[in-house]
Amino acid sequence: MMEEISLQEKIEKLPLGVACIDGLTNGGLEAGIITEIFGEGGSGKSNVCMLAACSALRLGKKVVFIDSEGFSSERFLSICKADNSKLKVIRVFSLDDQEVAITKFSKIIEKDASYGLFILDSFSEFFRLERTGDNQSRVIDFQRQLSLLSSIAAKRKIPVLITNQIYQDIANGDILPFGGYVVDHIMKAIYRLERLPDGRRKMTVMKHRSVKEGNSVEFRIVQDGISCEVKNGN
């Protein structure tokens, strides 16, 4: 299968509706690629996923949200007042579940143009928990699932958003996303989330095709989502 690419073709974006994040991402999540957000627990990864889902729902799109982190319906409803009847939240409990879910919805989305976003929160949870020491087998599993996700993004021209956990490189102390090069080289956009003092969060561009790496914004997680106001007491 081949497709000619037009240089005049407009790149579609899904804005999150948060000015500071939409500014950082140059308009939102890019369609046709996988975007990765990584960071420590509690840094705001799931909140960003929920905001993205809500944004797509407001546009009348169907959304698939595959969850391994413990999706909070209460939190989602506090963030999103849009009609959620087109949101499909699928809880997975193992690496096999995750692959079955990705495979199932890749086939559904390929035939249904009403889907506008695919979310996997978190991609690496079960790879981390179920690793057996067989690195080659794990790499093959990584590649197979990432290939399916890339296919969803490219064929249907929708954003695919995944979250990833972190580890510390014992050689130099760097904080890196789980999966290393195997995951990194497939991602076209990567953002890091960090927890800062006073409840602030920081989002940094680590890799992007059209945004300068190292650019960052700060925000707060609030009752109804994310606030770009970071002054104390707000």
UniProtKB/Swiss-Prot annotation:
One of its GO terms (molecular function) is damaged DNA binding. The keyword Nucleus does not apply. Pfam families: Rad51 (PF08423). One of its GO terms (biological process) is DNA repair. The gene is radB. SUPFAM superfamilies: P-loop containing nucleoside triphosphate hydrolases. It comes from Thermoplasma volcanium (strain ATCC 51530 / DSM 4299 / JCM 9571 / NBRC 15438 / GSS1). The keyword DNA-binding applies. Gene3D superfamilies: P-loop containing nucleotide triphosphate hydrolases (3.40.50.300). This is DNA repair and recombination protein RadB. Involved in DNA repair and in homologous recombination. May regulate the cleavage reactions of the branch-structured DNA. Has a very weak ATPase activity that is not stimulated by DNA. Binds DNA but does not promote DNA strands exchange. Belongs to the eukaryotic RecA-like protein family. RadB subfamily. Keywords: ATP-binding, DNA damage, DNA recombination, DNA-binding, Nucleotide-binding.
